[in-house]
């Protein structure tokens, strides 16, 4: 029987979703992106070759897998055109494998200009966005003034609506931010170029996915960012502009929630965060520097260094609740190789009391101090191990403690960047 699996991040993004999605795509008929935009970077490593994707789903490197961009994604024509060009240069027939919802809002140059002007104006209070226009594009969607992929079917109407929208946004840029305005002609030219090249990829995504399910095809729903960047459930205001939690898989694709069968949550064996915002277990010492260096912790999209810290089980328990996590995938276990001691955050010290639940308020979370459980590390290398029993005893005890204190079983463990460097204890698709 066909099975629909959702893959989401349980931290602040960068957990390794791209690798897991790529690994599981040989079991599915389609991979669906359901939220976010080209602010997300998913890194795939196959036989040592690295591919970084931002909009195209991570199944694109597999033959016979349909890659679908759902309505919850805000789509930059220029970014998608560049990504498709890059893939085709590498011999990947991206257009043969890709479908796009007509309901995707477009991210256009004036969104980028607004995003960057705002961050500049905020100064030290900047959110730390990627500056790629994602927030302003989602704002236009909610304000019901967005231009969508499907609007390009009528070029005259699109041009007229674009002129009206740009009058508004250029007024804000010029008169509020004292920034340069954006050229209407250049934006229109870019949008029409996208239509000319890729309009054949546009399809009714909910009907397509329903058809695949009737045909008995497995589907994988690929989340972007992570649970605590969710606009509602994250560390607001240091969040992204979309719902990154599993519920968005339904609204961002058009699949009914009853048809989502299980949710795999991904977390690193430690924790990272890019940009501003509370991070209770952050390590600003030699151990944090070691994790960053060993884990090559630089953003795939922004190339900004990631902040590193110990795994936060208080946060992980909350992520499991708000996503209905069925099982966990632990990534970058090998990064912990060689450390003499490891720590797991099991509670917080807040307002002179011990707190076992993560506060949603960012100001409160900043004041939370981690309470750690110490465990022995291991000196052996775990890189490339594919059998659980081959892991060092201390590594197995570490994983078992994560299972015990999170309340969620671990089904998959990543021991390196390559697709093959993985331990699969239980397959989400039952294969």
UniProtKB/Swiss-Prot annotation:
Q: Which cofactor does it need?
A: Mg(2+)
Q: Does the keyword Metal-binding apply?
A: yes
- A GO biological process this protein is involved in? 'de novo' AMP biosynthetic process
Binding of GTP occurs at 13-19, 41-43, 306, 332-334, 414-416
Task: Summarize where substrate binds, as residue positions.
Answer: 300-306
The protein's annotated pathway: Purine metabolism; AMP biosynthesis via de novo pathway; AMP from IMP: step 1/2
InterPro entries assigned:
Adenylosuccin_syn_GTP-bd, Adenylosuccin_syn_Lys_AS, Adenylosuccinate_synth_dom1, Adenylosuccinate_synth_dom2, Adenylosuccinate_synth_dom3, Adenylosuccinate_synthetase, P-loop_NTPase
Which is one GO molecular function term here?
magnesium ion binding
Q: Which residues bind IMP?
A: 14-17, 39-42, 130, 144, 225, 240, 304
Subcellular localization: Cytoplasm
A GO cellular-component term linked to this record? cytoplasm
Record: active site? 14 (proton acceptor), 42 (proton donor)
Q: Name one Pfam family in it.
A: Adenylsucc_synt
What does the annotation say about its assembly with partners?
Answer: Homodimer.
Which family, according to UniProt?
Answer: Belongs to the adenylosuccinate synthetase family.
PANTHER family according to UniProt: ADENYLOSUCCINATE SYNTHETASE
Q: What is this protein called?
A: Adenylosuccinate synthetase
Record gene name: purA
